[in-house]
Amino acid sequence: MSELELAFQHVAGASAPEAERVQAWLEPVFEAHGRGGELTVRIVDEDESRALNRDYRGRDKPTNVLSFPCELPPGLPAEAAQILGDLVVCAPVVAREAAEQGKPEADHWAHMLVHGALHLLGYDHEDPAQAERMEAEERRILAALGVPDPYQER
């Protein structure tokens, strides 16, 4: 497995964790699945999040995290397969959700990044069985990071 190469784009004015912390939260996700490669994490405001969510998911509202797996056309060299995709995180939404849920903002950032990374690896939560599998993996990785179960009632 190769290392995780993170491109960090902080384009929103809102506060966000440092790139090193973001990488520390993401590396265990890809290590656990024997994957490495290039990943872009873009921190955005609500306007950009809303536009992307509307254009790609048909939902005209900002959201906490969007995952864009890299879909390469056939015939590209093997090195190209090392591009994992992009995560777009809306800093104001993550901050608001953390406050509403009564949890430390850093814990919610870790959860949203792990959640988004799992989507890049093919996890989903469209039906109860998928959601259970994905949430179990989130809990396992977050526990290893010292982050409490995000699904436990507070």
Swiss-Prot record:
HAMAP family: Endoribonucl_YbeY. Pfam families: YbeY. Belongs to the endoribonuclease YbeY family. It comes from the Bacteria. GO terms for cellular component: cytoplasm. InterPro entries: MetalPrtase_cat_dom_sf_prd (IPR023091), YbeY (IPR002036), YbeY_CS (IPR020549). Single strand-specific metallo-endoribonuclease involved in late-stage 70S ribosome quality control and in maturation of the 3' terminus of the 16S rRNA. One of its GO terms (molecular function) is metalloendopeptidase activity. Its main location: cytoplasm. It is an enzyme of class 3 (hydrolase). It comes from Halorhodospira halophila (strain DSM 244 / SL1). Its cofactor is Zn(2+). Binds 1 zinc ion. GO terms for biological process: rRNA processing. It is found in: Cytoplasm. This is Endoribonuclease YbeY. Zn(2+) binds at residues 115, 119, 125. Its EC number is 3.1.-.-. Keywords: Cytoplasm, Endonuclease, Hydrolase, Metal-binding, Nuclease, Ribosome biogenesis, rRNA processing, Zinc.
